[in-house]
Amino acid sequence: NRGAQLVLSRSSKEMVTELFKLEVPEIAEEVIQIRSVARDSGARTKIAVKTNDVRIDPVGACVGMRGSRVQAVSNELGSERIDIVVWDDDPAKLLINTLSPAEVTSIVMDDDSGIMEVIVKDENLALAIGRNGQNIRLASELVGWEIQISGENDNLDVKESPENALIKYIGVDQELADKLIENGLSLIHISEPTRR
């Protein structure tokens, strides 16, 4: 008989929470709350924090002077990267905080399915998704919604023919639209007019 076994794990989310309680007195004193944790153990963690005192910056308190507090937690976790964001009760605002610095241009939420359709600027798409999809997976876990993400140009109406787009947006006739397409015009970028 081997007796009772004790299994220890360094991969749990609760370990991250407890380490922050040790390093950040404001968390231990419940002035700051860790509202959500998403973790890819050994690689990256995202935490969302909220303050009960408007005079305290919850992210700054968790990061510490010159990053000392978050670095101490990271060192305990084998140099795991830790992202700290401000909690928001609105899942869309929380997602925007979580994906920053990637710029979100649109969010459509379907409460019934629990899916958020998110559009980011094309140049931010790779940043928002992260290496091997890690960033968007952790963001989804942190927010508690399934996230479908795409760039702005991924959402162009693919059913609309180039000829029809020229006619509709530029105001040319069918004959000119056909000639433009024949001569290699294949993509139209439509932007709002600038005001001077």
Descriptions of predicted regions:
Residues 1-187, 191, 195-196:
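RNA-contacting regions in translation and RNA-metabolism proteins
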